[in-house]
Amino acid sequence: MRTIENSLLVFNQGEDEQPGRHEGVSVAPEKPALKRPARYRVVLLNDDYTPMDFVVDVLMKFFAMNEEKATQVMLLVHTQGKAVCGVYTRDIAETKAAQVNQYSSECEHPLLCEIERAD
């Protein structure tokens, strides 16, 4: 004998007409379509005082980059004035930017990080 698992249909043997029930079969309500959350870029800004090694350290520590990738992003910050460190949902982007700004301040560097909407 076979068993039915995860069935969405329920058979009704009663004769009562109830909303949502047709011919002895109950129809599961449709799940609402979920909207993807907005995405935000975390952007590191260049300054003339923060050492390049510190920027690489920040990228490795807060954005889980390896040394090679962190160096590439640091050079983009240095040559273009800013670079994207990652794209996240708003809460995560705000948290990462705040962590970088706090860490930089504690280490007495003027390095700044901000977020901007990506989509």
UniProtKB/Swiss-Prot annotation:
**Domain of life here?**
Bacteria
A Pfam family cross-referenced in the UniProt record is ClpS
GO terms, biological process: protein catabolic process; proteolysis
Which InterPro entries did the record assign?
ClpS (IPR022935), ClpS_core (IPR003769), Ribosomal_bL12_C/ClpS-like (IPR014719)
The UniProt family comment states: Belongs to the ClpS family.
Q: How does it assemble?
A: Binds to the N-terminal domain of the chaperone ClpA.
Reported function: Involved in the modulation of the specificity of the ClpAP-mediated ATP-dependent protein degradation.
Mind telling me what this protein is named? ATP-dependent Clp protease adapter protein ClpS
**Which species?**
Marinobacter nauticus (strain ATCC 700491 / DSM 11845 / VT8) (Marinobacter aquaeolei)
Gene, per the UniProt record: clpS
